Amino acid sequence: MFLIITRDTMFFTAMKNILSKGNVVHIQNEEEIDVMLHQNAFVIIDTLMNNVFHSNFLTQIERLKPVHVIVFSPFNIKRCLGKVPVTFVPRTITIIDFVALINGSYCSVPEANVSLSRKQHQVLSCIANQMTTEDILEKLKISLKTFYCHKHNIMMILNLKRINELVRHQHIDYLV
């Protein structure tokens, strides 16, 4: 069984046509996940305008104990699902490489050029969603010094001179 987590109906239709050999289920919100029915599924997550990380959605996915998770994202997030095998792929992956990845054979999938820790991605998502510093500190339960350290590292990784340049960053749609 394949669970496709996306808000993009065109993306789901394309995945359904590519994965015609199996049972394909479209999931748009966390209430649609059935822990018993979808147990040990193969999960495909599209993060474009659908940032499921750091939410109840991700904990629901973890409870499914998926066989493998493929995430369409320009970011590589280290240990985002604990011990569940996760592969991050760009949306520009070829169909041949994607099918090879699904079948478990070797393919030359280009890795994301931006690799973040789980906490860095969480801080970045909060900043992209225009949360205030105080709200971020309260939500993530971190100190101001830790926040500034994460913010500085994120700016270095993304090549930003000022954090407000994040609004014009090419991958901002994957964070909201």
From Swiss-Prot:
Residue ranges constituting the HTH luxR-type domain according to the UniProt record: 109-174
Induction: By acidic conditions. Could be induced by EvgA via the induction of YdeO.
Swiss-Prot/TrEMBL keywords: DNA-binding, Transcription, Transcription regulation
InterPro entries: Sig_transdc_resp-reg_C-effctor, Tscrpt_reg_LuxR_C, WH-like_DNA-bd_sf
SUPFAM superfamilies per record: C-terminal effector domain of the bipartite response regulators
SMART domains hit by this protein: HTH_LUXR
CDD domains, A to Z: LuxR_C_like (cd06170)
GO MF, one annotated term: DNA binding
Gene Ontology BP term (one): regulation of DNA-templated transcription
DNA-binding region: 133-152
Disulphide-bonded residues: none
Task of the protein: May act as a transcriptional regulator of dctA.
Protein's name according to its UniProt entry: HTH-type transcriptional regulator DctR
Gene name as annotated: dctR
